[in-house]
């Protein structure tokens, strides 16, 4: 028999998280699982994100907290503007009825992310408790949305957490082709304009890898986090000039 993984600690409300080294490893049943329990309130979420921990659980499960190793991140200078996305983005920018908005419809965005069908996932981890928790985090000024609007309709977007000069991506949705990717491009432009070098993507997916995200050691991620999470946070607003950070800095890649 193989070695049994370390028991997962159950946290009472307000209890501190265990050291990240206590998280289950890559050969355990649930790599990255660190703890269960605690509360999904604003102070707990801020403490968690400040240490490189995030909640992720399905309906009917307790709150589960994760810190995977390796960690999937997008270095903002490595964002891949594929030729097809560049074409979609230029078309979007040329249409006066298309625009990017920040934080105008946060709850609509998170609920749209929850209902977005995803390959290999029969349900969603954005359960009602998570919607409520991140809506509270949004009202407190830490959770934000990037929204793609076309002719007055919300057609795509993402939501994230921002602490200092760290951005933690959470989920995306699209009701039109490339709508979520355009939102991500806007976020990357914002980050580049404000010297935010890394967007946390949490876990590896083929979709994120295709856009330039890659895995790094958790220790490197936590080191970068510690250096940036306490820095002065830039105002959460989008300026059209940020597109220059994308269109002039990027050479389009195939396809």
From Swiss-Prot:
GO molecular function terms noted in the UniProt entry: leucyl-tRNA--protein transferase activity
The keyword Transcription appears for this protein: no
Top-level enzyme category: transferase
GO biological process terms on file: protein catabolic process
Entry keyword set: Acyltransferase, Cytoplasm, Transferase
One GO CC annotation: cytoplasm
Coiled-coil stretches: none
Lineage top rank: taxon: Bacteria
EC number from the UniProt entry: 2.3.2.6
Swiss-Prot/TrEMBL catalytic activity: N-terminal L-lysyl-[protein] + L-leucyl-tRNA(Leu) = N-terminal L-leucyl-L-lysyl-[protein] + tRNA(Leu) + H(+); N-terminal L-arginyl-[protein] + L-leucyl-tRNA(Leu) = N-terminal L-leucyl-L-arginyl-[protein] + tRNA(Leu) + H(+); L-phenylalanyl-tRNA(Phe) + an N-terminal L-alpha-aminoacyl-[protein] = an N-terminal L-phenylalanyl-L-alpha-aminoacyl-[protein] + tRNA(Phe)
InterPro entries membership: Acyl_CoA_acyltransferase, Leu/Phe-tRNA_Trfase, Leu/Phe-tRNA_Trfase_C, Leu/Phe-tRNA_Trfase_N
Subcellular location: Cytoplasm
Main location: cytoplasm
Job description of the protein: Functions in the N-end rule pathway of protein degradation where it conjugates Leu, Phe and, less efficiently, Met from aminoacyl-tRNAs to the N-termini of proteins containing an N-terminal arginine or lysine.
Entry-linked NCBIfam families: aat
Entry's family note: Belongs to the L/F-transferase family.
Protein name: Leucyl/phenylalanyl-tRNA--protein transferase
């Amino acid at each position: 028999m193989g070695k049994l993984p370390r028991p997962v600690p159950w946290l009472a409300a307000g209890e501190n998280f265990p050291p990240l080294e206590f998280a289950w490893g890559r050969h355990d049943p649930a790599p990255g699982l660190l703890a269960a329990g605690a509360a999904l309130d604003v102070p707990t979420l801020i403490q968690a994100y400040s240490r490189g921990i995030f909640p992720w659980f399905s309906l009917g499960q307790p709150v589960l907290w994760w810190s995977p190793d390796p960690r999937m991140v997008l270095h903002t200078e490595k964002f891949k503007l594929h030729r097809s996305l560049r074409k979609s983005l230029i078309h979007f920018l040329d249409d006066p009825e298309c625009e990017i908005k920040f934080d105008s419809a946060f709850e609509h965005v998170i609920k749209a992310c929850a209902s977005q069908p995803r390959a290999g996932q029969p349900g969603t981890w954005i359960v009602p408790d998570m919607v409520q928790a991140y809506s509270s985090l949004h009202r407190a000024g830490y959770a934000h949305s990037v929204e793609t609007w076309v002719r007055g309709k919300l057609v795509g977007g993402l939501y994230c957490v921002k602490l200092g000069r760290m951005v933690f991506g959470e989920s995306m949705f699209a009701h039109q082709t490339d709508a979520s990717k355009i939102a991500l491009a806007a976020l990357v432009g914002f980050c580049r304009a404000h010297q935010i070098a890394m967007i946390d993507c949490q876990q590896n997916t083929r979709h994120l890898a295709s856009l330039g995200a890659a895995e790094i050691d958790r220790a490197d991620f936590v080191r970068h986090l510690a250096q940036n999470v306490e820095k002065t946070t830039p105002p959460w607003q989008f300026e059209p000039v940020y597109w220059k950070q994308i269109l002039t800095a990027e050479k389009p890649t195939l396809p």
